[in-house]
Amino acid sequence: MLLLDLMSSPSPQLLVAAAQQTLGMGKRRSPPQAICLHLAGEVLAVARGLKPAVLYDCNCAGASELQSYLEELQGLGFLTFGLHILEIGENSLIVSPEHVCQHLEQVLLGTVAFVDVSSCQPHPSVCSLDQLQDLKALVAEIITHLQGLQRDLSLAVSYSRLHSSDWNLCTVFGILLGYPVPYTFHLNQGDDNCLALTPLRVFTARISWLLGQPPILLYSFSVPESLFPGLRDILNTWEKDLRTRFRTQNDFADLSISSEIVTLPAVAL
């Protein structure tokens, strides 16, 4: 089994120290060791094109702290250059502008489906991006924003902010994180949805990285089981594409994609 060559890459101890020294400063609690190593693996997966973005939600560290963290990793020789901190609302994402633009362009071509889970309807339903014209325009806006950044890669880790006062962040993040079937809902109906007690097929994709450490959770998303037959082609295409990209790198091993059916009394998006 090919795992990270620890002789040519930073040790786990250095990766943990890089996160704790930059993301746990001041009153913020330092992330635990397991979180630090998983975050480093996710960031490397973004740099290698295995996922478009990572949404940072470990503690209250902001964009400047994440910039320091990525620069610390680069100082260790851990990352390729060109990663970007994208701030949307109060949230920070670590993205590769090149890879995320390629992904968003595919989204505009209809490679993903959306599941409307608005609380006003009795059951979830599938809809296309053409039925969500505001969202389609938003995806195009994000592409334009990120393409502008790619012209100036002089900074080791760049940063930008998008204003999002009227965005459905659940849907936007689902797209940016590379989910093949993001959820959407009408914002004027609040955060409620129609997924309570609905059987969901939960997909997870994991990859092995550091010897002796748990695998990296690369993707985790769900689709209503009742809609799964109609979404099978899109999900199969997503899996085939992920396996193809996985074969182009040698930092990770043992890609595992699995699914299980769960039913929950309430689902928070």
UniProtKB/Swiss-Prot annotation:
It comes from the Eukaryota. Signal peptide: none annotated. Pfam families: DUF4504. InterPro entries: DUF4504. Coiled coil: none annotated. Belongs to the UPF0739 family. This is UPF0739 protein C1orf74 homolog.
